[in-house]
Amino acid sequence: RLGKEMNLFAFDESVGQGLPLWKPKGGIIRRELQDFITEELDKQGYFQVFTPHIGKLGLYRTSGHFPYYEDSQFPPIVERDAMKKLGEEGAKCSDLINFISTGEIEGFLLKPMNCPHHIKIFDSEHRSYRDLPVRLAEFGTVYRWEQSGELGGLTRVRSFTQDDAHIFCTPEQVGEEIQGCLGLVKKVLTTLGMSDYGVRLSLRDPDSDKYVGDPENWDKAEAALREAVQSLEVGYTEEPGEAAFYGPKIDFVVKDVIGRDWQLGTVQVDYNLPERFDLSYVGSDNKAHRPVMIHRAPFGSLERFVGLLIEHFEGKFPTWLAPEQVRILPISEKYSKEADMLATELAEAG
């Protein structure tokens, strides 16, 4: 409610449920947050990349997002020629679904995650151990099919932007890289005064079949995250069954003004996607080795983060983040020229 009153964002039924429209004032807040995190990423040696909003179904079959994540995705986009051919053959919707599931028909998917695209960027070059870690960052918009009854303001939407990054490193670099990621999440939260947070270590359920990969790799990933979270010196809980299908994760959980928990920043260790995509680098022994992948997003979803910030500050943002920092009010029309000059001077000063 407050966000709409402040003219930060809007929703429109003709655009679609859960698809936020950022208005100019909201855009200022979003840009300031992006500039803030980008400055930190530059200091830590990240490279910014840009990727498409869609990818071939085959990409997500390799990653496992299709079909493991299928219920949370928008339906696939089928190529026009294939649709025309199916129509001429009198195919039914059930036939189309079967053809997509078996891979007989290729299609595209609105990306539910940025990681497969970043993997392909990493894999587009020959890599040596001297190049690692490679840190790729993107403000990437992703799409999830949230049920209409679950949608709410900016905190539960169908289109959202992550301050996403993926680190490709050697096994020996994992611990240090995790610490860097956790430090960044903590800096984001403390800078914005969000001190009421908890930490959750999300692990696999060994009795479930929803996870991919070698159990030994899972054990290594969980051990690395457990060691890292213990170094934070904050209380944390372990949550079996809450891991992503490809790896365990550390979630930073923030309380809103009425005490509800919301997951924001996250750090994940992943031995499985490098295996599924057959990633490699040349080690000091001149042999091929498998990198480890770390997923991290300090804000999590920019939409959710801004939604919680609006409540946290009750609309009274700190000056650097406020959509309107200065208002010049000439006390008489004869001072209008001076007011315009002052406004120009302030704008040029940033």
Task: For each feature predicted by the language model, list its residue ranges.
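NTP/phosphate- and nucleic-acid-binding module
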Residues: 1-350
